[in-house]
Curated annotation (Swiss-Prot):
The keyword Cytoplasm does not apply. This is Small ribosomal subunit protein uS13. Keywords: Ribonucleoprotein, Ribosomal protein, RNA-binding, rRNA-binding, tRNA-binding. It comes from Agrobacterium fabrum (strain C58 / ATCC 33970). One of its GO terms (cellular component) is cytosol. Residues 99-122 are annotated as: Disordered.
Length: 122
């Protein structure tokens, strides 16, 4: 198993697919990395040489923010919104949908399981 950006990449898969196992790299960025490094798209991870793995590692470290750094930046952005007290920050703080979705019905994923209200009847 190759290890890139702290993630074990599955050896049997094509490199383009295997790179998407890294948080912050989707299909588009994976293909972009392959084009930069010059590795054919149909090549599988177990066929990569150590030099090619090193090239991929360096390309990711140089050009992309992935894994822990990306997660940290995302959480810091959310924390900043919450500290500002803006509308989006309040929605994050209250655990409600942030992007304008309705909450009268639905939004159960964000709000959690339904809570029974004592004394309320239909």
């Amino acid at each position: 198993m190759a290890r890139i950006a702290g993630v074990n990449i599955p050896t049997a898969k094509r490199v383009v697919i295997a790179l998407t196992y890294i948080h912050g790299i989707g299909p588009k960025f994976a293909q972009e990395i392959m084009d930069k490094v010059g590795i054919p798209a149909e090549k599988r991870v177990h066929q990569l040489t150590d030099a090619e793995v090193l090239q991929i590692r360096e390309a990711i470290d140089r050009d992309y923010q992935v894994e822990g750094d990306l997660r940290r930046e995302t959480s810091m952005n959310i924390k900043r919104l919450m500290d500002l007290g803006c509308y989006r920050g309040l929605r994050h703080r209250r655990g409600l949908p942030v992007r304008g979705q309705r909450t009268h019905t639905n939004a159960r994923t964000r709000k959690g399981p339904a809570k029974a209200i004592a004394g309320k009847k239909k």
